[in-house]
């Protein structure tokens, strides 16, 4: 059987090219190559599938944010209606806090309710060491400058907390908590009652994703200092 001679201008070829030429000339290993190709293709599909499932691949899209509103809830429409009676009534119900938190996440201001909840939990501490550790954690997360979830409170209140954080008490965050409470009550809470998140609950309908709104202007406590709350402030 005649075999064609093949000449190469370059004698120093990479190993992969030599292997490819060897297989082409001898015609062997075709079946094995086909199987390996299928395996490699499957592995690529699996890697791509995993990549597409990563949140950081897509970024924080509107769909992923709005999906938070579709979270299943077991609250009855009758119970949800009571949340409109007062902000205090909403916060006294776990499902109310959950629904309000999901709403605030669509406005990128969930740090307010998270701080309020953290303060409520902090006031239940019994052991001195636990008080110190939790106070420090709250301060670093919500109060200090450039905190990861810094709440919008006045400079004087921040200074008072900063000076007392070395020897905290169960009342160290009372003033800041009441400020944040009033901000939510007179701002976010009113929008929540008009939102699809809440309207779907009182109508007993499944929630659906809604268009996101950009973060609203950050109000300060001074914006509401002349407004008197009709419910008890958390002190």
Curated annotation (Swiss-Prot):
Main location: cytoplasm
Modified residues (Phosphoserine): 49, 216, 218
InterPro entries from the UniProt entry: RGS (IPR016137), RGS_sf (IPR036305), RGS_subdom1/3 (IPR024066), RGS_subdomain_2 (IPR044926)
Keywords for this protein: Cytoplasm, Phosphoprotein, Signal transduction inhibitor
Pfam families: RGS
Keyword DNA damage set for record: no
GO biological process terms on file: G protein-coupled receptor signaling pathway; negative regulation of signal transduction; regulation of G protein-coupled receptor signaling pathway
GO molecular-function term, one example from the UniProt record: GTPase activator activity
Domain RGS, first and last residues per copy: 86-202
Compartment annotation: Cytoplasm
One Gene Ontology cellular component annotation held by this UniProt entry: cytoplasm
Expression sites (tissue/organ): Expressed in bone marrow, spleen, fetal liver and lung. At very low levels expressed in heart.
Role played: Inhibits signal transduction by increasing the GTPase activity of G protein alpha subunits thereby driving them into their inactive GDP-bound form. Binds to G(i) alpha-1, G(i) alpha-2, G(i) alpha-3 and G(q) alpha.
Protein name: Regulator of G-protein signaling 18
Protein species of origin: Mus musculus (Mouse)
Gene assigned in the entry: Rgs18
